[in-house]
Each structure stands twice: as structure tokens, then as C-alpha cells.
Amino acid sequence: MVYLSQDYIGELPKTHTSVSDFDLSSLPRDPNELFTQWFEEAVAHGIGDPSAVTVATVDEHGRPDARMVDIISLDEKGFHFGTSAKTAKVSQLEQVGAAAMCFWWQPLRRAVRVRGTASRHFDGERLNVWCVKPEHFEFTFLWDDRLHSDRVIYTLDEFDHWDRIRLQR
């Protein structure tokens, strides 16, 4: 049984707005600066809930789990988000100590993936604040044809400096 056909989904309208080209020649050395620039452009263009992010973890059996949260802040320590103290997410973060995050600002055709070490930043009775310290960023800019993209990957080297790789599809 097909619940949502490929034809049906393929005919849905795709709304997107070109803000600007992804100028690969002027990328900052620090991916946090590029993230901040993209975030501020999403806010300026009225993107709903630009702070919404999918946070992915794994359970004790290695099965992935993902859910939506809102980031509270981004600073030199990483991305901060709040969660109820007694959730599967907290248990998984405590056990594994790592998380992945994915921001998707669809109307701008931009996505940012982040992977890093997760640690508890604030331990409350009912609320915890967690921090994901990025070790890997991937910025994706989809072209108008939606078949091609520019991607830039930042990874931390052994000296805590960011290396950049540009990929084009």
C-alpha cells in the first residue's frame, strides 16, 4: 500500500527564495561565523523558527533517534539547547556523549549539519541545558535546479584549528 505516492509528492509546490549566491571565495576561517551569517539571513528573511534544529542521538543499541529542539545560544563552547531532565534524549546524551544537529532553512535552500561532543551545561531538577561542541560542520547551498549544490565542510584538526573542504555536486 502506498500512502503518499511519488507523483503526489513530486507535484507539491517548492517554495524557495534566492538570497544570494554562496560566495565560496570569502568564507570565514571559523564556521561559527558562517553559521551566524546564515542564521541572521534566515531571521532577516522571515524564516519561521530559524532556531529550530533536529538533534540526533543514538540509544544503547546503536539505533538513531532524532527530535526537534530550539537552540538557546551559540558561543565559543558550542550550541546550547534545553530539554526536560528525564527524557530518552538526556539518557542517550549521557551514555554516548555525542550528538548531531541539522538546521534546514528551506526557503533559502540552506542546510547546516553539525556533529560534536555533547555535555551537560546546566543540571536542573526539571530542565537541563546541553551543549554540543562542534567538531564537524557541513554547510549546503542548493542551486535553483535543486539537483546541484555547493558544500563546504569544516573539521577540527589535532590543534583545534578549522580545516575547510569545498565540495560541489
Stretch-by-stretch model annotation:
Residues 1-169:
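Binding-site signature for planar aromatic cofactors or substrates
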